[in-house]
């Protein structure tokens, strides 16, 4: 039996059944096809595509999303593409409202690199629908954002529900650390004004049964550690034990900032006192989610998480620093590796830092710690 679900918001009745129908029909018939086309565009963030301007993929992604936005039947909607010399483009939209407040909605259009490890039949630039999941690079991070934002606004306007003055931005450098965003925001400052709230559609949710709010995210320090020991590769049977191993020295340097046995960051300046309110919230979230805190990740059989306490796992991923090696150069593949003592080891470091840590001073400290007095005079 069909039931008409209703609610009241600011004195206006809401037909939830009608709203749900609009969302589902729009998502299935309009958003999924357009989002699938967006997935096909290899719009790598500038950090991963130094020739992004010449390649034109970011431009294509921005144009694609902007074109869809312009077609939406939203009263008062304006859509424009903002450009600054040498910077990635940004979509700026406005929807005037009936409430004398401003809300800023944020999303981004650039993507992470392709990576490897896709399951058979799946790939980064080929959208594949399997059940209720759409696979492909950038669909969830963060291509869906503009689609979701404007569909939500349509739902409000369809039922005459008052809303604030809405300003929307879709940037294209987020996966590189948003280096272009500050200049765009400065250029748009007078038009954006002072938002009463910022909605950032680039996060996650614990489950589908609750409304989740992201209170803070960790920042990231990204850099490369390059250890050089020789000007040419030499036979390890001849030089091994004489020329120091660049990999060993890299490990030694990393031990200055991280305990290799536990993974704990050993630089005090990268830690903060966690507010008691956040600890309490982590405990509540752990009770709600249970093992889903870690079981949502693709662990191999027999591999265990870093802690058996679910609350501690939540705090680990939100309020504590962590180091990961996300790339490496100077190493041949295992199949191509011979008996050569390599000239260098180059590692890309990704260091997550919690809210409250000064990123500039932390970056300087990490660089100094890793590079001062390298073992055996390595370069």
Range-by-range predicted roles:
Residues 11-16, 26, 206-208, 222-379:
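Metal-dependent amide/peptide-bond hydrolase catalytic core
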Residues 119-120, 160-161, 214-220, 317, ...:
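Short glycine/proline-enriched loop/turn "hinge" motifs that connect secondary-structure elements
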Residues 34, 134-147, 175, 240, ...:
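Short, conserved micro-motifs enriched in small and acidic residues
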Residues 143-159, 178-186, 244-256:
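Active-site-proximal alpha-helical scaffold in enzymes
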Residues 163-244:
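Histidine/acidic-residue-rich, glycine-tolerant segments that coordinate divalent metal ions
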Residues 11-116, 344, 348, 361:
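N-terminal helical capping/dimerization or prosegment-like subdomains
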Residues 100-170, 193:
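Active-site metal-coordination/substrate-binding segment of hydrolases
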């Amino acid at each position: 039996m069909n039931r008409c679900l209703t609610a009241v918001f600011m004195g206006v009745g809401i037909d939830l059944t009608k709203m749900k129908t609009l969302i589902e029909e729009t998502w299935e018939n309009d958003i999924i096809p357009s989002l699938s086309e967006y997935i096909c565009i290899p719009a790598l963030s500038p950090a991963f595509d130094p020739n992004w301007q010449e390649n034109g993929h970011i431009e294509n992604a921005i144009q694609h999303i902007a074109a869809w936005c312009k077609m939406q039947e939203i009263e008062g909607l304006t859509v424009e593409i903002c450009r600054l010399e040498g910077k990635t483009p940004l979509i700026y939209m406005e929807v005037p409202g009936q409430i004398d407040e401003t809300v800023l909605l944020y999303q981004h259009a650039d993507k992470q690199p392709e990576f490897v490890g896709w399951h058979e039949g799946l790939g980064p630039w080929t959208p594949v629908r399997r059940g209720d999941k759409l696979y492909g690079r950038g669909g969830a991070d963060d291509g869906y954002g503009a689609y979701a934002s404007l569909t939500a606004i349509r739902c409000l306007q369809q039922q005459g529900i008052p809303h604030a003055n809405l300003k929307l931005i879709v940037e294209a450098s987020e996966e590189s650390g948003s280096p272009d965003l500050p200049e765009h925001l400065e250029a748009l400052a007078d038009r954006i004004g002072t938002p009463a709230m910022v909605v950032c559609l680039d996060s996650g949710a614990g489950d589908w049964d609750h409304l989740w709010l992201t209170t803070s995210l960790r920042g990231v320090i990204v850099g490369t550690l390059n250890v050089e020991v020789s000007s040419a590769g030499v036979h390890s049977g001849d030089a091994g034990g004489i020329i120091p191993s660049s990999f060993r020295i890299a490990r030694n340097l990393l031990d200055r900032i991280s305990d290799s046995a536990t993974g704990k960051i050993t630089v005090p300046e990268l830690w903060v006192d966690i507010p008691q309110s956040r600890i309490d919230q982590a405990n509540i979230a752990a009770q709600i989610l249970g093992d889903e805190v870690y079981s949502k990740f693709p662990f191999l059989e027999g591999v265990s998480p870093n802690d058996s306490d679910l609350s501690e796992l939540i705090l680990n991923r939100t309020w504590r620093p962590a180091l990961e090696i996300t790339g490496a150069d100077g190493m041949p593949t295992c199949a191509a590796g011979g008996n050569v003592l390599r000239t260098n080891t180059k590692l890309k470091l990704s260091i997550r830092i919690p809210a409250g840590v000064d990123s500039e001073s932390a970056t300087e400290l990490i660089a100094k710690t890793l590079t001062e007095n390298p073992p055996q005079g390595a370069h």
